[in-house]
Amino acid sequence: MNQPSLDKLMEKVDSKYTLVVLAAKRARALVEKQAPLVSVAKSAKPVSIALHEIVDGKVSYRQAKGGIK
């Protein structure tokens, strides 16, 4: 995983765990046919698209008392 860099991704979230959960949930939504929020190559995989969306600020999260919502 070279693009986007982990350093840039970590600027958008508070922990690596949050990053993994956020990317996984967004990738799952992409697999279920939601449209990508960024322009990427057609050969890009859902997790790669999700990471690009996170670093571009297109996907965000809010910390709930009981976990990520």
UniProtKB/Swiss-Prot annotation:
Coiled coil (residue ranges): none
SMART domains registered for this protein in UniProt: RNA_pol_Rpb6
GO molecular function, one term: DNA binding
Reactions performed catalytically: RNA(n) + a ribonucleoside 5'-triphosphate = RNA(n+1) + diphosphate
Organism domain of life: Bacteria
Pfam family, one: RNA_pol_Rpb6
UniProt GO cellular component terms: DNA-directed RNA polymerase complex
Keywords, comma-separated and alphabetical: DNA-directed RNA polymerase, Nucleotidyltransferase, Transcription, Transferase
Family matches, as InterPro entries: DNA-dir_RNA_pol_omega, Pol_omega/Rpo6/RPB6, RPB6/omega-like_sf
GO biological process, one term: DNA-templated transcription
The EC number(s) this enzyme carries: 2.7.7.6
Function text: Promotes RNA polymerase assembly. Latches the N- and C-terminal regions of the beta' subunit thereby facilitating its interaction with the beta and alpha subunits.
Family to which this protein belongs: Belongs to the RNA polymerase subunit omega family.
Subunit structure: The RNAP catalytic core consists of 2 alpha, 1 beta, 1 beta' and 1 omega subunit. When a sigma factor is associated with the core the holoenzyme is formed, which can initiate transcription.
Protein name stated in the entry: DNA-directed RNA polymerase subunit omega
Gene name tied to this protein: rpoZ
